[in-house]
C-alpha cells in the first residue's frame, strides 16, 4: 500500500466523542452512532416514520425460469389506514425452504435482474420495487409517501431507503424468507438509498450500494478518480453540485454545506459535522459491500476508498473487521451481470461460508 492510501487526516476519526475523549468499546460506539445517525438525519437525509404496518395483496403469480421460480406482483399498502401503496415484483425459488431476500430499488419500471437464474439457483429471493412510486424524481412533485407522513422532513433518498424497509416489513411475514438474511442493494441514486436503508434498518444483514458516489459510499471532502486525488468537480460529483441539481433528494438546508455556484468546487463541505465514512460505519457490525467502477470518475472511486478505510476502525472495534468490503472492477457506471455476480458471491460467502474473499482490492487498482 502506497503512502497516498494512508488514512486521510481530513476524514476525522470516528472513534472519538464530541468532547474529544476516545471511544474504546462497543457501548461507547453505539452511543456515538446514535449521535451520528441524528446528525446525518438533521443535516442531509431527514427523518423517516417508525411505522411497520403493511398489508400485501397479491396481484398476480406465475411460474418463471421454466418452473424453477415463481414471479409475483404484490401491492404493498402502507401509511395511515393503509391507504397508500406501491408495487413489489418478487421472484423466488419454486421449492420449499426459507431463502435470503435481496431488496432492490429500481428505476421506473425497469424490473429485472441479469443474474436472476443464477440467484434463484443459489437460493435467493429477489424483491424489486419502483422507488418513484414512493417519490417521483422531480424537484417540485410531492408524492404518496410525503402525503402519508406530512410531519417528516425527509428527502427522496431517505424515502426510497424507507421503501426497502417497507418491503422488508412485508417479506418478514412470508414463509419463504429467511428473516435473518436481508440484503439491500441499488445502483447510483438507488445505491445511495440502499446505503441509507442499511444504516438505519438493523434488519438488513448485507448493505450493497453499487456506484453510489456522492451522498452514498463516496466522500464529500476528497474527490478523485482511479489515478488518485484531483479535487475536480467537473470529473467527480461534489456536494454543491448534487445539492444544486437534485435538491429534492435531501433535507432542506443540506445545500449550505456545498458550493452552489458552478463548477461547484469543494470547500464548504468542511463545515459538515460528518463525512460518508460515518454513514458507512452506521452499518457496522453488519456487512457492507460496495461495488465501484474504476472508470466511473463521477462516483469518486478514490474518495470511496478513503471512506472505506476510515470506517474500518469501527468494524474492527465491533469484532466485524471482515464485514467492511469494497470491490473495484474495470468499467463505468452500471449495475450489470458482473456486479450481480460479485454481490451473489459476497452473500454466499457471508451467509453460507462459500468461496474465498477476492474483494477489498482498491490498493491494487487505484493510483
Predicted regions located by residue number:
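Loop/turn elements at helix/coil->beta-strand transitions in domains of secreted/extracellular proteins
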Residues: 98-102, 122-126, 178-181, 202-206, ...
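Alpha-helical segments flanking ligand/cofactor-binding loops in enzyme cores
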Residues: 117, 195-196, 281
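Primarily recognizes the serine-hydrolase "nucleophile elbow" in alpha/beta-hydrolase
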Residues: 113, 166-234, 241, 268
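Alpha/beta-hydrolase-fold serine-hydrolase catalytic core, especially in secreted/extracellular enzymes
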Residues: 1-85, 92-97, 202, 251-252, ...
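Mobile cap/lid helix-loop segments that gate and shape the active-site cleft of serine hydrolases
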Residues: 211-279, 300-308, 316-320
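Generic beta-strand/beta-sheet core signal
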Residues: 129, 185-187, 209-210, 291-293, ...
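Cap/lid segment of the alpha/beta-hydrolase catalytic domain
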Residues: 97, 103-173, 213-225
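Flexible loop/turn segments at secondary-structure boundaries
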Residues: 110-112, 134-137, 191-194, 214-219, ...
